[in-house]
Each structure stands twice: as structure tokens, then as C-alpha cells.
Amino acid sequence: MPVITLPDGSKREFAHPVSTLDVAADIGPGLAKACIAGRVNGELKDACDLIETDAELSIITAKDEEGIEILRHSCAHLLGHAIKQLWPQTKMAIGPVIDNGFYYDIDLEHKLTQEDIEALEKRMLELAKTNYDVVKRVVSWQEARDTFAARGEEYKIAILDENISKDATPALYHHEEYTDMCRGPHVPNMRFCHHFKLMSIAGAYWRGNSENKMLQRIYGTAWADKKALSTHLARLEEAAKRDHRKIGKQLDLYHMQEEAPGMVFWHNDGWSIFLELERFIRRKLNQYTYQEVKGPLMMDRVLWERSGHWDKYSEAMFTTSSENREYAVKPMNCPGHVQIFNQGLKSYRDLPLRMAEFGCCHRNEPSGSLHGLMRVRGFTQDDAHIFCTEDQVQAEVSSCIQMVYDTYSTFGFENIVVKLSTRPEKRIGDDAMWDRAEEALKQALRANNIEFTILPGEGAFYGPKIEFTLHDCLDRAWQCGTVQLDYALPSRLGATYVAEDNSRQTPVMIHRAILGSLERFLGILIEEYAGRFPTWLAPMQVVVMNITDKQADYVEEVVKFFKEQGIRASFDLRNEKIGFKIREHTLRRVPYLLVVGDQEMENKEVAVRTRDGVDLGKMRIEDFAAKIHQQISLRSLKLLEE
């Protein structure tokens, strides 16, 4: 007679084993209709799974995040159901849930076209609209293998052979004549899967190994209702307009090419923004009392073996050899910073020692994962490492947190999600050390009034960490900042300091990044601002245009004055209509467009308008320069008169 305890503390007693769906029906028909799955004693279960003993139960509906994930997973199975009807020879590989959707990797000789995707989506909807029940069967490993062998599903057989123990009891989910295998849970009925859209097709190697066969990956998105789907698609449409790759080309900021995959060719205007970002962070480093250093691009393999990176990262490291020595191009800066710390005797009086670098790093990311500036192989990291005593950890972490928020607010990012990752099962150090480390991070966050979520067991083996994820104007999440405690690397690389009692002690190392990769952060900014950079960041802040040739000399004089004032300015003296020139520079997103005619030249003025078409009237050039200087010094996100 199981007693079921609900989230509100109420209890329901049953005379026999019950499913989540039974409990929902006992509460009311509305909840039974909405029930997707259950969380039984903290574990997600299918709505049909029987509960035989006393348990705590949360009923999952489409209003819950887990409910949305489950219906997305079931949409992947629905895709499999439809594709096997349209192309019966298809072999199904894997179909997991991803952010905002799902995908399925398939092996099909026929190369799918956009027309095929539309036909597939139509068939999926036709099937879903029949509202058929999804039937779950738990079977033996052998029965599961026999089922897929009879269907010629070689990838499912490979998963069973290579990933699932022979004494396991896999779950098979039957969508009418289509059968799939999954740990679940899944929706009990396809009425939950009416609001989806197939988005794109890509290539993907089986098991992510380039030596294996290239499969076709079909991406889709799925939501609980029509409104949520429409909102998401509208957001994607806006994101496409803001795509940094598209805007980067329009504004001539950078390019990438096949001969250097994942490496950026910065053009003048893009490099101007990059340098401005670097200058901004450098001012922050000075404000927060950091040393700035520069380590070598390559170091001997021996050092990477001592640091432990060779075991964990060697596949992602570019290597070269010379004179019978093997070198690795650095994927990160930390071992180099420990080498700098180790030069000369350090005392407790030297701590905390804050060491920062704009480190040029390289990682051999898979070519299929490269994506504009967001995922590259060569990048610049605004990396810093703080060497301190254990007693100094909380204060140093608190300072890092302040620096993160101080920096992000300058760019207009206010919605920041913070997560604290705690001790994993496999770790160095004793529980007392981890207790102190985790408590120091918690206290630093609380001291700054930061709300945070704890991710149990997600920390690195060498220490807990804080992750800062910013949300942009389209509510997309970008994990950029990190503060990571490290109790291992200083010891591995022999870093010590002389303590107050003259003993040799190992410092705690704090890894700290604010922007992360400057390339990636610049990509985020391009999309956040849609290329309409605030004045202080804009590669060209002012363009001055003449109406006739008579004003050409005065225009050049004005631009020379602005440049002397440190304002990035240019002139446009082309023999074109002024409307044409204004339109062209508006498309280039130049913040201020200055027009000079006879009257402006005579009065030593300029007619000022913004890229948004706002007419600010006539100003003396000294007055305009003063206003712009104030904007730049304040790093204002708005233009004049906004």
C-alpha cells in the first residue's frame, strides 16, 4: 500500500502499486490530461511506471522545464517514426535533446533536401495529430538486440553492444509500427507533440569520430504550445538578422578562410574594436591591481606532462617538433603563469599576486564545430591567475566577482546567471579543504548579494568554481566568466612561498576570466548591438561629409581636429549626392554623420545627425567634440539626445 507524498506535503494512500498517471487521475481529470511524467524520489520516470513503495512524487507537465525536455525528446522519436515511413531503408542512430530542441542522426544514402525536410515535417504533424499512445516495454538486452537486428538497425545494435550491459533491461518505446530505444522518460501520448518545426540538416560523424561514416543530422525545435513556438521562431529570425558572420562581412570587420580554419583575419575596423576591448580590460586590470605578463606561445611537452594537461588535452593541442624536442602550442595560460611565479623567492608578503595576460591560445577544435567568432581554434583569452593564501581566497574571489559585474554592466548585460560547481566524486584533498573552499566561494557571492545555483559534483577535481552566464537581448545564454579555485597545479609545478613561520607553503591558485575569449565576446557584442556599437567601441565614430567641393578643405580641417582630439573620424568627399552618402554611412552604422555646407563652413560648425536619423542641429566643432568625449569617457551605451 504505497503512500504518495506530493510537493505540498499532502499524502495519498493506495491499496496497490500506482503510476504517476494514476495519481494524477486521482487528483483530477485536468491534471491527468496534462501529466507528461513524474519525478519519483527525485528521479524522472515515465507516467506509466509503477510506484510500489512509499514515495515522494512531483507530477511533470508541459509547464515544467523537464516536461518541455521530455516532449522534445519524444519529437525526436516522432521524427524517426515519420522518416521510416517516408524512407524505410533509413538506419537510425541517436536522437537526443539539445537547447530549445532536438536532433536525430540518420544513415540514409539519399541526401535530404529542403523539400524532403518539409515533407518530413508534414508527415510528423499528420502522425502527431492522430494522438496515438506511446507504449513503453522494458525488455531483456537480448530481446532489444533481436528487435533491432530484425529491423536492420545497426547503430542501435552498436549502442547495445558497446554501451549497455548485457544484464541491463533497456526500455523500448513503440510509436505504432516504429520502435526506438531510450532511457526515457517520454510523453504518454502524442497530443503533447503538436508544436514543432524542423530547422536544418548538417553532417555528423557517427560517435563524433571522423574515421566513421558521415551521417545526416536533422535539427528540430519543439515547444508546449503554438505561442511559444512562434515566439522562438521570431527570436531565431531576429538572431539571423544579427548573425555576427553576416554583419562582420557587411561592416568589413574580419574574415575567415579555408586555408586557416578557425583562425580570424582581422580587418582594420574589426581590429579597432578588438583593441578597444583590450584597452578597456587593461584599465580594469590596473584598477584591480594586476600585473600584466606575456608568456611564450609554445612550451616543451615535458611541462604540459608535469602540469597534467597532456593527459587531458593532448588531442586538442597543436604540436610541433624541433631538434628532437616536442613542443605544444598553448591551449591555456596557467602553466606559463606558474613559471613566472616560480622565478625568484616569494614571501607571504608578496601575496596575493595577481597575474594577467591577453594570452594567444590555440585549441584543435573539430572542424564541424567551428562557428564564426563563437567557436574558433585561435583565440585571445583575458586570463588571470591569482596566487594567494587560503585565508585570502574569499576576499580575492569577491574582488573577481565585482570585476565581472563591473565589466558586464558596461556593455549593458544585466541578466547574469551564476552557478557554483562543488566537489566531484573523484577529487584531490580532504573534505575539510573542500568545505573551506566551497564556503569561501559562497561567502564571496553572498557578500556581493549574488543569487546563485549550486551544481553538486560539477566542480573540477582540483577545486570548486563559479560560472557567470550572461543573457543577451534575445535571451540567449553565453557562459563567459569563470572563477576557479585550483589546489593542484601550483603543487604539480613546484610553486611555493615562504610563510610567516619561515616554512615553505603551496599557494592557492585562482583561475579568473572575465570575457573569456575576446573573439567570442566580440561576436556576442556584434549580435547584441546588431553592429550598432556604442560610440566608445565603434571603429569609426564620426564621418564628415561635404555637400559640394567648396567645403572639401574645411571638412579635412574638421576631421584633422577630431583626430587630434582622439576621436576616430573620417571624411567622405566623393562627388555623390549627400543623401546617398548619408544612407551609405548609416548602413555602416557610424554613430554620427556630420554634414557641412556653405553656412556651416562660414560659421565653423557642423550639422549633426545620428545613424538613427535624429537631427541634432548645428554645433560648433569644439562643442560637438566635448560632447563626444564625455560619451566616450563614460562609455555610454546611448547616442546623444537618446
UniProtKB/Swiss-Prot annotation:
Localization: Cytoplasm
Description of how the protein assembles with itself and partners: Homodimer.
Record's GO cellular component terms: cytosol
Enzyme Commission (EC) number: 6.1.1.3
Stated role: Catalyzes the attachment of threonine to tRNA(Thr) in a two-step reaction: L-threonine is first activated by ATP to form Thr-AMP and then transferred to the acceptor end of tRNA(Thr). Also edits incorrectly charged L-seryl-tRNA(Thr).
Positions of the TGS domain: 1-61
Catalytic activity: tRNA(Thr) + L-threonine + ATP = L-threonyl-tRNA(Thr) + AMP + diphosphate + H(+)
Signal sequence extent: none
Cofactor(s) required for function per UniProt: Zn(2+)
Record region (Catalytic): 243-534
Cofactor binding note from Swiss-Prot or TrEMBL: Binds 1 zinc ion per subunit.
Family statement: Belongs to the class-II aminoacyl-tRNA synthetase family.
A GO MF label: ATP binding
Protein name: Threonine--tRNA ligase
Positions with a binding annotation for Zn(2+): 334, 385, 511
NCBIfam families: thrS
Protein keywords: Aminoacyl-tRNA synthetase, ATP-binding, Cytoplasm, Ligase, Metal-binding, Nucleotide-binding, Protein biosynthesis, RNA-binding, tRNA-binding, Zinc
